[in-house]
Structure formats: structure tokens, C-alpha cells
Swiss-Prot record:
Family: Belongs to the class-I aminoacyl-tRNA synthetase family. MshC subfamily.
Alphabetic keyword roster: ATP-binding, Ligase, Metal-binding, Nucleotide-binding, Zinc
Cofactor note: Binds 1 zinc ion per subunit.
Protein's organism: Nakamurella multipartita (strain ATCC 700099 / DSM 44233 / CIP 104796 / JCM 9543 / NBRC 105858 / Y-104) (Microsphaera multipartita)
Motif 'HIGH' region: where in chain: 45-55
Cofactor(s), by name: Zn(2+)
Binding site for L-cysteinyl-5'-AMP: 43-46, 58, 81-83, 227, 249-251, 283
Short sequence motif 'ERGGDP' region: positions: 187-192
GO terms of biological process kind: cysteinyl-tRNA aminoacylation; mycothiol biosynthetic process
Protein name: L-cysteine:1D-myo-inositol 2-amino-2-deoxy-alpha-D-glucopyranoside ligase
């Protein structure tokens, strides 16, 4: 599937810093240690609605990772999926009286436009679950053959499930206890109480065909895949059995990333699936997480239509630390617009060199993407009328992705 155009990323003098990131699996900020080609998989959208600021904040966080690796001299192989077949998409299409494929294509196109406006570097591989269907069905059959998957004894709908005991370390990525995992499974699309499952936490691999639902042929019979196996297969087949970073929002820690890691590790025989599991915090509005189910969404496209500068949006979302849950408000946007204006005025100045400011940007981002510290240093630069603007503007463009000139 086509992604979106890449923004230009200027080169900046000096040497990039090695990046340290928080790893959900260890609870520690650890160095990333990629080889010449750094590899990253970030879970993409389920395209049944427009991109909201919660989505945008996640993709901006991993865009910073991408930019820091480039600055440190790595090539980056970035893969992102699109969950273009899933229950929420089908439900929304039925509600609106449109085909699920037409709805998905429309929202994917809008997402591309939003990412372009926000100057997010695109993935090298942008893969829909539907286009990877043959790969996914082969992987499900492989898990069945290995004894890691089974059918529930349901005469009408003998769906295929993954046996979580097959991984030998289920739970290591999230570090949640069983009660928490069961609660989150029930809240986030799982079915822990379905009869016939070996373990309550066993996730769905293949849903056999239901009336009035799209389905695909497979060795297991017609049906469609579960969510987690799609990401395991798309990442593994394009990057390899071990990746440097798996990323997404903090709501994906469990069950999605736990289960996709377990699938990938059983399929490849190698562990861990990712050297870092890194997660972005949630964006809230009026005291609640911004989500489609709550209907409290601020859409990127709507703000763009209102004439909001996408660089102000980007700067507003980067004002808080990426791992923190944080609130969006009119005040956040107003502050970001004022800051952007100050920085743009400073970027046009001539004066004494500001190499120390460029180094402060690198140092702050290298320390678990500490954007608040970076922004503080840039505010001080903007306030000092003796400092030159050109080198700092290039660094802000290259590393923060905010265009000042």
C-alpha cells in the first residue's frame, strides 16, 4: 500500500547522540543499540474514522525516534501496518451504510494527508492486513502444525486460538498480573470467557466465516484473522525475527503487543521479538482519554480545515513528555502557536553561533525523547537576541520535525 511523501530532513553539523528509550518489558530507560540499519515497527490505525490527536501524538513520538536514529548515522527500516479488516471497521460501515472497503480507503487517504501535513517521515513498508492475508493464513496454519494453536470445540464456529503457554514467557512484555491481563483482555476485544478455550487469555487467530461478514479462503476454511497475528506476520516478514523497537500507544501494551510478540516468537523460535517495547501516553480532553468510543475527539483534519498551522499542532503535542498521559486544550494550542511565532522570529536572526543549543536538542532527545527539556532550551534561545538562528532552525527541522523557515 502507498504511504505518503517524505518531508526533507536537513543534515546538521556534528555527531548525533546514541538514543536511550524506556522499555516497557524491563521498566527501564535503556540504550537502543541498532546496527547499521535500525528497525522499527509501529502499529497503524484501524481506518474507520479520521486521525485524532491521540493518534498523532503516537506517530510523532516514533517520528522523533526515526529522526534521532538518522542523525546518529543509521539507516532506518520502518514498517507500519493498517488494520483494514476488524470489527470496529465493519460496525462503522454497517452503521453508515457504506462498504467497509470504501470506508477504509477513505480514512486511509485522510490519514496519509494528516501525516504529510504533520511532516511525519513515512514507513518504508506500509502494509494493510488485507494485502498480507496469504502471509497471515500461512502463519496460522504453521502455529496449528506446531501445536501452538487449536480450534475451539464449537460446531457452528470452530475458531482458531493461540495457546499462550506455547510461548513459554507470556506476560513478560507487559509485566501485568493475570487479573489485570484478564480485565484488559475483556475490555480490549478479547473473549476470556468463551467456552472451549484452553486458557482464558488465549487470543483469537482465525475467526471462521460468519453471515454477512467478509471472509478469505485459507487452510482453516473461510474466515478472517485476529488482530495480533497480523502485526506479528507483517513485522516478521519485512524486518525479520527480531526488531529493534515495537511501538504504539500505551493502550497496546496488553493484549496487543503481548500477544503479537508471543505469536512472533513461536513462529521464529527467537526471542525477544523486540529489543525495546516503547509506548506513548494517551491524549486527553476534558479529563478523559481521547478515543473514538467516547466520541471526545479532536481531529487533525478538522484543525487543518480551521486554518491551524500543523507545526503548531506538532509543537503542542511535543510540549509534554511522550510517555505521559496529557491533556489537549485550546490553551495548549494557543501556547504552541505563540511559541512557534517566537521561534520563527528567532530563526531569522543573525548573531553569534548557537552550537550549544543544537547540542542541547540532541542531548535532550537522546535521553528518552525529553521534549520538555528541549523546548525549554529553545525558549531560552529564542529569548536571547544575540544568538544566530540558522543552525538551530535546521536542527529543529531535522530532529523535532518542526519547520521554522
Amino acid at each position: 500500500m502507498q504511504s505518503w511523501p517524505s518531508p526533507p530532513v536537513p543534515g546538521i553539523p556534528g555527531t548525533g547522540r546514541p538514543l536511550r528509550l524506556y522499555d516497557s518489558a524491563t521498566g527501564e530507560v535503556r540504550p537502543t543499540d541498532p546496527g547499521p540499519v535500525a528497525t522499527m515497527y509501529v502499529c497503524g490505525i484501524t481506518p474507520y474514522d479520521a486521525t485524532h490527536l491521540g493518534h498523532a501524538a503516537t506517530y510523532l513520538a516514533f517520528d522523533l525516534v526515526h529522526r534521532m536514529w538518522l542523525d546518529a548515522g543509521h539507516q532506518v527500516h520502518y514498517v507500519q501496518n493498517i488494520t483494514d479488516i476488524d470489527d470496529p471497521l465493519l460496525e462503522r460501515a454497517q452503521r453508515d451504510g457504506v462498504s467497509w472497503r470504501k470506508l477504509a480507503d477513505r480514512e486511509i487517504g485522510l490519514f496519509r494527508d494528516d501525516m504529510t501535513a504533520l511532516r511525519v517521515i513515512p514507513p518504508a513498508d506500509y502494509i494493510g492486513a488485507v494485502e498480507a492475508m496469504d502471509e497471515v493464513t500461512a502463519a496460522v496454519q504453521e502455529l496449528i502444525d506446531a501445536g501452538a494453536a487449536y480450534r475451539v470445540p464449537d460446531e457452528q464456529y470452530p475458531d482458531v486460538y493461540f495457546d499462550v503457554t506455547a510461548s513459554g514467557q507470556f506476560g513478560y512484555e507487559s509485566r501485568y498480573d493475570e487479573a489485570t491481563m484478564l480485565r484488559l483482555s475483556a475490555e480490549r476485544g478479547g473473549d476470556p470467557d468463551r467456552p472451549g478455550k484452553r486458557q482464558r487469555l488465549d487470543p483469537l487467530l482465525w475467526r471462521v466465516e460468519r453471515p454477512q461478514e467478509p471472509s478469505w479462503s485459507s487452510p482453516m476454511g473461510p474466515g478472517r484473522p485476529g488482530w495480533h497475528i497480523e502485526c506479528a506476520v507483517i513485522a516478521g516478514n519485512r524486518i525479520g525475527p527480531v526488531i529493534d523497537l515495537q511501538g504504539g500507544g500505551s493502550d497496546l501494551i496488553f493484549p496487543h503487543h503481548e500477544c503479537s510478540a508471543a505469536h512472533a516468537e513461536v513462529l521464529s523460535g527467537k526471542r525477544p521479538f523486540a529489543r525495546h517495547y516503547t509506548h506513548a501516553g494517551m491524549i486527553g480532553l476534558d479529563g478523559e482519554k481521547m478515543s473514538k468510543s467516547r466520541g471526545n475527539l479532536v481531529f487533525v483534519s478538522r484543525l487543518l480545515h480551521q486554518g491551524v498551522d500543523p507545526m503548531a499542532m506538532r509543537l503542542g503535542l511535543l510540549a509534554g513528555h511522550y510517555r505521559q498521559d496529557r491533556a489537549w486544550s485550546d490553551e495548549v494550542l494557543t501556547a504552541a502557536e505563540a511559541r512557534l511565532a517566537r521561534w520563527r522570529a528567532a530563526a531569522a536572526r543573525t548573531g553569534v553561533d548557537a552550537d550549544s543549543v543544537v547540542q542541547a536538542i540532541r542531548d535532550g532527545l537522546a535521553d528518552d525523547l525529553d521534549t520538555p527539556t528541549v523546548i525549554e532550551a529553545l525558549d531560552a534561545w529564542a529569548a536571547d537576541e544575540t544568538l544566530d538562528g540558522s543552525a538551530v532552525a535546521a536542527a529543529v527541522d531535522a530532529l523535532l520535525g518542526v519547520r521554522l523557515v
